[in-house]
Amino acid sequence: MKLRLGMSPISWSNDDLPQLGGDTPLEVCLSETREAGFVGTETGGKFPKEAGALSAVLAEHDLALVSGWYSGTLINNDLESELERIADQLALFKAVGASVIVYGETYETVQNRQERPLSSRPKLDDYDVAAYGRRLTALAEHCAGKGVPLTFHHHMGTAVETEAELDAVMAVSYTHLR
């Protein structure tokens, strides 16, 4: 298998903190991504949300869509509601040929809430981890069935931040979650 590398647009501008590169145009991000030798990119807040427009802007820079962040809330949400929430992004990623969709658990995250200290982040132990794993597995199976596998991204300020928390989630999640 040939390895292809993609880049994240957060290297140019941060969707959570727009004061960090918020004035950097998408054109700069994409042209510099390609100039650096990357063949793909993740999505970000500045990217078109319609398949034709997204495909066109990527083609202008000879880039593929490799992935993109999805702010999930399965830890405190039912599967059917989450399937509705992810549907548009999943369809977009399928249409544009994304390799994966990146799930981050964002229920009650401290991100975008600068008045809250990191220590006030949600704690995984406050939730039914086994039930969460079952819902996460079902979502991953659904996404894989649509041709866009789901990957899991632990993140600072969320209920799944530490290595131990990530291990706990992975221990109760199954085959289709990467």
Question: What are these model-derived regions, one by one?
Answer:
Residues 75, 108-109, 156-160:
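Short, small-residue-enriched loops and turns at beta-alpha junctions
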